[in-house]
C-alpha cells in the first residue's frame, strides 16, 4: 500500500485539485485492495466521506500510509494551550464567551457577559461553524463565506478502552468499518494500558452507531483485535459533534474548494483577524495549522500598527 501511494504522487501533483479521490484512484488503481486501504485511511484521517476529498490528499501527511514514527504530546494536546497561556497570567479570561465583535475604522468592541472590551484589533480563533453565525460587524464578506462553505467538514469520534493485561505498541486499520486503533507509549516511556480508536466521516460513525453508545464499536474492536484483553466496562466514547463548543471535528480544503480559497478564508475583515486550523490551507485539520494561523494573525496585527 505504501509503495502504491508513493507511485501515485507524481500523478496526484499534476492532477487538478478539483478531481475527487475516488475518480483519481479508479483511474490509477482500479478496484485494487491498495485503493480500498487508501480510501479508508483518507476518509478516517480527514473525517469525511472520500467523495468529498480531493486527490491532493495523497500529497499530505494527514492521510499518509507510509510507515513512520508518530510524535505524541505527554499529558495530552491540551498541554500545548496551557503552556502557551502561562506567560499571560490573569490576562486570560476563562469561561467568558464573547457574544459579539463590532468593529469600525478606529477600534473594535467585544461584548462579553454584559460588559464590553475596547481594542485596537481582535483575533477570532473559534471553530468554523461558530464563526459563520457569530454576531460580527462588519459581517463576513460573501466571497469569504462562500469559500468557507466549500470546505470539507469533518465528523469524528474516539473510543478509549482500558486493557486488563499489558500490550505492545501497535497500530491497526479496519478498512471496512473505517476506524483505526493503536496502543502507544506515554511520557513515562511505558505503553499505556489503553487501546485508543479513532473513526472519521459521517458514514463511518453511522455504521459504528456512536449515537447509541460504544457497544457496536466495542464489538468491531474485539473482532479486529482479539489479541487485546479489553476492559469494556471502562470504555469512554467521545464525539466532536456532541460538543457544543466544537459541533464538528475539523475542516480542510476539498474537491469543491477553488484555487485561492485558503487566502480568502483567512483574510482579515478590517480590524478583525481570522485564525484557526480552518484558515491554514494545506495545514488545515492539524494542530500545526492552528499554530501557524496564530503566527500569521499576529504578524497581521503588528503590520496593522
Question: What feature does the model see in each segment?
Answer:
Residues 88, 107-108, 132, 136-140, ...:
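Short, glycine/charged-enriched secondary-structure capping and boundary segments
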Residues 7-15, 66-74, 145-150, 202-211, ...:
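Active-site rim elements
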Residues 2-97, 107, 125, 129, ...:
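Active-site/ligand-binding neighborhood in enzyme catalytic cores
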Residues 60-66, 138-145, 250-254:
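Short glycine/proline- and charge-enriched loop/turn segments
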Residues 96-97, 102-105, 111-169:
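Central helical "cap/lid" subdomain
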Residues 45-50, 80, 102, 130-134, ...:
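Short catalytic/ligand-binding loop motif for oxyanion handling, primarily in non-cytosolic enzymes
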Residues 14-22, 35, 74-81, 153-157, ...:
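A structural signal for well-ordered alpha-helical scaffolds and beta->alpha junctions
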Residues 55, 107, 155, 174-305:
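Conserved flavin/dinucleotide-binding core of flavoenzymes
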Amino acid at each position: 500500500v505504501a509503495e502504491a501511494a508513493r507511485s501515485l504522487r507524481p500523478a496526484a501533483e499534476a492532477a487538478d485539485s478539483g478531481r475527487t479521490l475516488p475518480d483519481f484512484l479508479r483511474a490509477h488503481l482500479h478496484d485494487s485492495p491498495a485503493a480500498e486501504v487508501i480510501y479508508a485511511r483518507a476518509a478516517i484521517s480527514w473525517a469525511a466521506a472520500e467523495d468529498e476529498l480531493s486527490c491532493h490528499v495523497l500529497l499530505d501527511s494527514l492521510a499518509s500510509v507510509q510507515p513512520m514514527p508518530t510524535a505524541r504530546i505527554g499529558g495530552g494536546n491540551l498541554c500545548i494551550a496551557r503552556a502557551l497561556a502561562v506567560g499571560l497570567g490573569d490576562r486570560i479570561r476563562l469561561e467568558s464567551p464573547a457574544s459579539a465583535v463590532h468593529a469600525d475604522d478606529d477600534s473594535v468592541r467585544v461584548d462579553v457577559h454584559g460588559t464590553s472590551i475596547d481594542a485596537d484589533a481582535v483575533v477570532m480563533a473559534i471553530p468554523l461553524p461558530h464563526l459563520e453565525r457569530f454576531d460580527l460587524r462588519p459581517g463576513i464578506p460573501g466571497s469569504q463565506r462562500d469559500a468557507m462553505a466549500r470546505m470539507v467538514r469533518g465528523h469524528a469520534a474516539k473510543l478509549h478502552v482500558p486493557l486488563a493485561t499489558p500490550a505492545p505498541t501497535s497500530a491497526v486499520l479496519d478498512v471496512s468499518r473505517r476506524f483505526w486503533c493503536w496502543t502507544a507509549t506515554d511520557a513515562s516511556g511505558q505503553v499505556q494500558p489503553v487501546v485508543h480508536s479513532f473513526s472519521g466521516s459521517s458514514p463511518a460513525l453511522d455504521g459504528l452507531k456512536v449515537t447509541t453508545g460504544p457497544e457496536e464499536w466495542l464489538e468491531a474492536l474485539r473482532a479486529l483485535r482479539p489479541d487485546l484483553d479489553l476492559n469494556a466496562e471502562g470504555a469512554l466514547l467521545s464525539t466532536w459533534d456532541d460538543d457544543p463548543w466544537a459541533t464538528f471535528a475539523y475542516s480542510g480544503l476539498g474537491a469543491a474548494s477553488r484555487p485561492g480559497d485558503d487566502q480568502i478564508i483567512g483574510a482579515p475583515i478590517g480590524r478583525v483577524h481570522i485564525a484557526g486550523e480552518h484558515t491554514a490551507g494545506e495545514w488545515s485539520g492539524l494542530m500545526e495549522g492552528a499554530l501557524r494561523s496564530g503566527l500569521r494573525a499576529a504578524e497581521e496585527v503588528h503590520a496593522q500598527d
